[in-house]
UniProtKB/Swiss-Prot annotation:
The lineage of its organism: Bacteria, Bacillati, Cyanobacteriota, Cyanophyceae, Nostocales. SUPFAM superfamilies: PRC-barrel domain, Translation proteins. GO terms for cellular component: cytoplasm; ribosome. Its main location: cytoplasm. Residues 1-51 are annotated as: Disordered. Belongs to the RimM family. Residues 145-226 form the PRC barrel domain. The PRC barrel domain binds ribosomal protein uS19. Binds ribosomal protein uS19. This is Ribosome maturation factor RimM.
Length: 233
C-alpha cells in the first residue's frame, strides 16, 4: 500500500513523510533598487484555513534571479512543476495569499524543488520568503489509485487487531521507508508523568489488510512480537 501526502492545514506536522518523500546561476542585479517581495496584502480573500493542503516550505534562496528552494510536503511533482496559482503563508500570519508559480524543477539527490514565483526577481526578494509555507486548496486534492492513501487521512485513524477486535491505538504519524510505517500511539493507561507508548507498524497489505476511511478504522494482523518491538515511553 502507498501513502500520498499533501499535508493539510496551516500547522505543520513533523515533516519526515511530508506527501514526503533543481543548478542555479542567477542574473546579477547590479546597482538596481531592490523591490519588495510581491506578496499580496492581508486583505486578499482566502478560503478557510481548514480547507488548505500544505505542499511545501521555502527553505532558502537559489541563485541571484529570485528563485527559491522548497522542501516538499507533497508526493505530487505537479505541485511544483506545473505553472499556476499557489498560496503563500508568511511566518506569523494566519491567512495565506495567492502567488503565481511560473516554473519549477527538481534538484536530484537533495529532495528539493527550485521554484520561480511571479514578481520575485532577485535574491533579496527570495531571501524574504525564507520560512514561508506553500498551500493549495483542499478541493485540488488529486485522485489516488487503489491502495493509495493521503497521509492526512491516515492520521487519527484507530487501529484494531483483526482477530479479536481489540483496540491497539491511534495513528499519530506516517514515516516514509522502503515500506511506509504507521506510528501508532498505544491505547493503554500510562502514568501522567510519562508519554504514551508508540509502536511502528509496516503499512503493507499483509499486516494492514483493512483500511476503512469512512469508519476511520484500520485492522491489522501483526506477526508475534511486533507490537512490543520498538515501543517505548
Amino acid at each position: 500500500m502507498k501513502r500520498k501526502q499533501d499535508s493539510k492545514g496551516a500547522g505543520s506536522r513533523g515533516q519526515g513523510a511530508g506527501e514526503k518523500k533543481q543548478g542555479a546561476g542567477g542574473r546579477g542585479q547590479g546597482e538596481k533598487k531592490q523591490k519588495k517581495s510581491p506578496v499580496p496584502s492581508p486583505q486578499s480573500p482566502v478560503p478557510d484555513p481548514d480547507e488548505w493542503l500544505q505542499i511545501g516550505k521555502i527553505v532558502s534562496a537559489q541563485g541571484l534571479s529570485g528563485e527559491v528552494r522548497v522542501y516538499p510536503d507533497s508526493d505530487f511533482p505537479e505541485r511544483f512543476e506545473v505553472p499556476g496559482t499557489r498560496w503563500l503563508l508568511r511566518p506569523g500570519q494566519t491567512e495565506p495569499q495567492p502567488i503565481e508559480l511560473l516554473h519549477g524543477r527538481y534538484l536530484e539527490n537533495k529532495n528539493l524543488y527550485v521554484l520561480q514565483l511571479a514578481g520575485v526577481e532577485n535574491r533579496t526578494q527570495s531571501e524574504e520568503l525564507r520560512g514561508c509555507m506553500l498551500f493549495v486548496p483542499a478541493s485540488d486534492r488529486p485522485e489516488l489509485g487503489e491502495d493509495e492513501y493521503h497521509v492526512v487521512d491516515l492520521i487519527g485513524m484507530e487501529v484494531f487487531l483483526q482477530t479479536s477486535g481489540d483496540l491497539v491505538g491511534t495513528v499519530v504519524d506516517v514515516i516514509p521507508a522502503g515500506n511506509d510505517l504507521l506510528e501508532v500511539s498505544l491505547h493503554e493507561p500510562v502514568p501522567s508523568d510519562k508519554k504514551p507508548k508508540t509502536v511502528l507498524i509496516p503499512f503493507v497489505k499483509a499486516i494492514a489488510p483493512v483500511v476503512d476511511l469512512e469508519t476511520r478504522r484500520i485492522e491489522i494482523t501483526p506477526p508475534p512480537g511486533l507490537l512490543e518491538l520498538g515501543s517505548g515511553v
